[in-house]
Amino acid sequence: MIKLSKIAATVAFALTSGVALALPVVDDFSVSQTKIEDYTTADGAVWAVQAAGDDILGGFRDVYVRKDLLANDTALSVSALTSNGSFSYSESTQQAGIGVVRWDGISTGGEVNTNGLGSLDFTIFGSALNVLALAADDQSPLTFTVWSGVNKLASSFTILSQEGPGSYVFNFSDFVGADFTNVGALELQINNGTGSALDTRIDMVSVVPEPGTLALAGIALLGLGAIRRRKS
């Protein structure tokens, strides 16, 4: 169904713009990254090797984890893994930290490149960011930070997840002072270093189209379904 929805979104954009545009997907996590783990506190983050791919916003993805609690449990960790088309963040029993996925172009590790996306206009694609979670623990914080505008200032917004699968919509208007017509970098943080033993698995991060585009996408889905029925 997800693949069919992607096709419908592409068709809808072609209808509304008259030209072929890239699918409004930030990351479908089809490009894998090896598992990273942090067992100790107060010594910085553990970074994954940067991933590159056409299905990643800006062409590159940075991932890191940082353990904040408990300092004495050096046999237990917080970890992240991108495989089989999803991103997973996990905390061992009584451990807490953060997991971060960053889209800021080819820059690797360290400080965010606030203009790594080159002033991208997100409003071409829609009016909100959407996180499609395959699984999540109750009350796990999901925080988006966007660097935007002429000065690429940061603005953040947090949603608390519910247990199980879910779709979490971050309206552009929720980000105070943000200019989504001029985006330089984007980051998604899972947890906040306090709540312990929280796990989250994300299937896709995308831009939610405007209501009119969604309607066209539905029409496109019906058309594709009719074509498939005729072929069968």
Label every PLM stretch briefly.
Residues R229-S232:
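Short, charged juxtamembrane terminal tails flanking transmembrane helices
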Residues L23-I98:
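N-terminal targeting leaders for non-cytosolic proteins
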Residues V150-V207:
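Terminal, low-complexity interaction segments
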Residues T93-F125:
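Short beta-strands within extracellular/lumenal beta-sheet-rich domains
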Residues M1-V25, T194-L221, G225-I227:
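Short, threonine-centered small-residue motifs that mark membrane-proximal processing/anchoring sites
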Residues I124-A136:
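A short beta-strand element within beta-rich, extracytoplasmic domains
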Residues S127-L129, L142, G184-L186:
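Residue-level detector of short, conserved catalytic/binding motifs and their immediate flanks
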Residues Q139-W147:
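Beta-strand acidic-aromatic groove motif in beta-rich domains, primarily in extracellular
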